[in-house]
Design a protein with these regions (language model features):
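Bacterial N-terminal signal peptides
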Residues: 9-17
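Sec/Tat signal peptide C-region and signal peptidase I cleavage site
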Residues: 19-24
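Bacterial N-terminal signal peptides that target proteins for export
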Residues: 1-10
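Signature of exported/secreted
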Residues: 25-322
């Protein structure tokens, strides 16, 4: 499994250290939440999603992208075929450039890979890779021309390789559904485990990641509702600080050979990933999801120091037709 927050290589049913809050120890019987996958074939939902990103480096730069699409799960010989289609984007009135980009985004979104998942919900593979790659290739040729595309084809072949497309498709599924399958968690108890993942600013550098997760409460699947048919899952992870410092120091030791880079260094680097998922415990059908990543640090260049940060948040709201 490889959730967006970091590459989790064990399920939540692995040997994790559970730390029960004092309140749980002092009160009555334990409330165990049993998370099981049971999406029925024929599941259909509209999903509203928004991505917000703010980058601060002397000045602040923000980006907000919203979309609305259909999620559908159909029966498949190996389990379920999960597809994403009928993408809709906010109209850009009076802005031809923005309208053109919206058209491109709609075409690209229409080629989002379909997933094949096993009856137990585990991710198996993406469906029909060849047609996805052909469609993306055709779209880029139209945008850039054959000559411009020729210069980029090698890079795009890497980006659009079956392995790359599989990783991208699996990340979201595993973060929201896959990593929670068959976990039995005490309500209010905090669980911890350690894994390894690449640093956001140094993707070739792998460091230990520490994680905590819990079932916070039983809540309504509908925001503001009075029922308690769903649960709130909370997951936070961050890299081991000592390992980060060592990795950064070693990285910058290799930079003096690059002209102008010998006086640049990171004095601090902090990373925090967080997921909040409101889901049905008996089916793992999500209703509300928020996934965020904060990367911040202090960069030193000669005698000057500057703070840099990037905050990225994705939200999803699901409305089920059946």
């Amino acid at each position: 499994m490889k959730p967006q927050v970091f590459a989790a290589t064990c399920a939540l049913t692995c040997a994790c250290a559970a730390i029960a809050p004092a309140s749980a120890q002092e009160t009555g019987p334990v409330d165990t939440v049993r998370l099981r996958f049971a999406w029925p074939a024929g599941t259909v939902a509209r999903v509203q999603t928004t991505r917000f990103r703010e980058t601060i480096n002397e000045t602040a730069d923000t980006m907000v992208v919203s979309a609305d699409y259909r999620l559908q799960a159909d029966s498949h010989p190996e389990g379920l075929l999960v597809s994403y289609d009928d993408f809709r984007f906010p109209s850009a009135v009076g802005d031809s450039a923005a309208s053109a980009m919206e058209t491109v985004a709609q075409r690209a979104a229409a080629m989002v890979p379909k997933l094949i998942v096993a009856p137990d919900g585990s991710f198996l593979r993406i469906h029909d890779v060849a047609s996805i790659r052909a469609g993306l290739d055709s779209m880029f040729v139209e945008l850039m021309g054959e000559d411009g595309m020729a210069a980029m084809r090698e890079m795009l072949n890497t980006v659009m390789s079956e392995d790359a497309l599989t990783v991208m498709a699996a990340e979201e599924w595993n973060a929201i559904v896959g990593m929670w399958i068959d976990a039995d968690l005490e309500l209010g108890a905090v669980y911890q485990y350690e894994d390894q993942a690449p640093l956001p600013v140094l993707p070739d550098v792998v460091v230990p990641m520490l994680a905590e997760f819990m079932v916070e409460d039983r809540t309504s699947c509908v925001e503001g509702g009075s029922d308690t048919d769903c649960v709130t899952l909370h997951f936070v992870s961050w890299p081991d600080p000592d390992s980060v410092n060592v990795a950064i120091r070693r990285f910058f030791e290799t930079l003096p050979a690059i002209p102008g880079a010998d006086n640049i260094s990171f004095e601090e680097l902090d990373v925090e990933n967080e997921m909040i998922i409101v889901t049905e415990p008996g089916t793992l059908r999500p209703h509300r999801v928020q996934i965020s990543k904060l990367v911040s640090g202090v960069v030193k260049a000669g005698d000057e120091r500057g703070e840099v940060s990037q905050f990225d948040v994705r939200t999803y709201h699901y409305t089920y037709a059946r």
